[in-house]
Amino acid sequence: MARFMVERTFPDGLEIPPTEQGAQACMSVVGTNAELGVTWVHSYVTEDHKKTFCIYDAPSPDAIRNAAKLNQLPAEKITAVRVLDPYFYLAAEVR
């Protein structure tokens, strides 16, 4: 499964309340994604809540686009990414 970063813009800001309603909204997205083999790993949200950078595992960018459409979420840019972990290099020095 490939990993992707999805950039989304919310002109009015994204507000997900820390309530049961907010949890249900998130779990609805998770459920719809799962039907398409897409896993939402986590998201970064800008301070003004108008932009998110979401990390996903998915079979393809098209699967993410389809999930976004079903969830009525924007998906302006989808980029394949890989982890660059500085601690990996520290461990390599020890070997």
Question: What is the predicted function of each stretch?
Answer:
Residues 1-34, 39-41, 46, 50, ...:
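Short S/T/G/P-rich N-terminal loop/turn motif that feeds into the first structured element of a domain
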